[in-house]
Amino acid sequence: MKPTLPNYDQSSVLIVGDVMLDRYWGGPTSRISPEAPVPVVKVEKIEERPGGAANVAMNIAALGGDAHLVGLVGEDEPAQALTTTLESLKVHCDFVALPEFPTITKLRVMSRGQQLIRLDFEDSFHDVAAEPIISRMQQALSSVKAVVLSDYAKGALEHVQLMIQEARKVNVPVFIDPKGADFERYRGATLLTPNMLEFETVVGKVKDEDDLVAKGQQIIEEFDFEALLVTRSEHGMTLLRRNMEPLHLPTQAREVFDVTGAGDTVISVLAASVSTGKPLDEACALANAAAGVVVGKLGTSTLSTIELAEAIHGSQDSGFGIIGEEQLISAVKQARARGEKVVMTNGCFDILHAGHVSYLNHAAELGDRLIVAVNTNESVQRLKGPGRPINPTDRRMAVLAGLGAVDWVVPFSEDTPQRLISQVLPSLLVKGGDYAIEDIAGGAEVIAAGGEVKVLNFEDGCSTTGIIEAIKGGRG
């Protein structure tokens, strides 16, 4: 299955669960302490990242979705740091502050890409009354299209059955990242996302895929779930639904540096996708692609819609399609080694029309490979003003990547692609319109490197602005 990217601006998700603050202290180490046989780390870098349910919310917000987060914190400095970080990322925080408990904090000491030690500051929340967290959930349910319950067994989901019932009353789907072997407490949820270890803790050792499917269907029936998404590490994921064939999704991970927070990414992309109207199977395929990206990063990480678009368009494997700058530079080097002529152009391409297609076909005919550099949303807004772009970056790139004339699509955030072009240095740089060669961004750098710059004509009568004005005027 090759899913299409939804418009995550339309997603709205309530996340309830165990929030925590992940702190990273990092630096070089070159000696052993004289006090004990341990390395001495000279701390040069300190990072703070939301973890647990907060990481789920951060992932949804990073995609452009509306994330409303409810959880338990202390009245302390880590709670303030967590709230400040999340709100800067446009996550709406509605925490229950309990002065008798510390905010859950995990401090990791890192050196040379390795974790040397983890220090946990926590006292799991217990015997907390249901009313404060349930009332916050009730207030948020009217404005969301999906609920995620993120369970790290730290106490925030002590009243999880009440939470499931509240969501079911208003027909909002409930997705749960479970913890422990007691699936009874999650009875009635829409979908659970156990990893293989968690799944086998409940059902026993799984012999093969047929056994996994059979035992999974038993779990669905026994606990009144609608579905299970079993994450299986290097074997990918398996989606099991009531009275439907299983869907096995192979892993898309290329390199695994750190699985921290990968489960959070899976459930966040899954819930955000369903909340935009995506069917469950397509949402799971998107979550699988997202997991393949984040395990290649260190620590709890988010991903952008551009990274997700790259993953689902297969650019990492095929070498073509939507691609990042570093990958593009590598791909161009390989193309040159094959003796191929690389052509590059750029633009906003907000509403792709016949004039664009004609222009890109012409550009592609001038060489063997065509790169299209695309202005990001912020760049378009600065150039075109309020109300633009009509289509977000990921969608504009997806449409361009689907054209037969285009080999690579890459985003840039500056007002001009001069820096990007000077890094790529194509054999031929082309631009549409009535530009003078000397006024084309990146042209001087391409010519200095021995390349060419050309201006191509646009097809008369075709323009994005004209299309927008025609729509406003009601003309067909």
From Swiss-Prot:
Keywords: ATP-binding, Carbohydrate metabolism, Kinase, Multifunctional enzyme, Nucleotide-binding, Nucleotidyltransferase, Transferase. The gene is hldE. The keyword Transferase applies. The keyword Secreted does not apply. This is Bifunctional protein HldE. Its EC number is 2.7.1.167, 2.7.7.70. GO terms for cellular component: cytosol. It comes from Aliivibrio fischeri (strain ATCC 700601 / ES114) (Vibrio fischeri). Homodimer. Pathway: Nucleotide-sugar biosynthesis; ADP-L-glycero-beta-D-manno-heptose biosynthesis; ADP-L-glycero-beta-D-manno-heptose from D-glycero-beta-D-manno-heptose 7-phosphate: step 1/4; Nucleotide-sugar biosynthesis; ADP-L-glycero-beta-D-manno-heptose biosynthesis; ADP-L-glycero-beta-D-manno-heptose from D-glycero-beta-D-manno-heptose 7-phosphate: step 3/4. It catalyses: D-glycero-beta-D-manno-heptose 7-phosphate + ATP = D-glycero-beta-D-manno-heptose 1,7-bisphosphate + ADP + H(+); D-glycero-beta-D-manno-heptose 1-phosphate + ATP + H(+) = ADP-D-glycero-beta-D-manno-heptose + diphosphate. Signal peptide: none annotated. The active site is at D264.
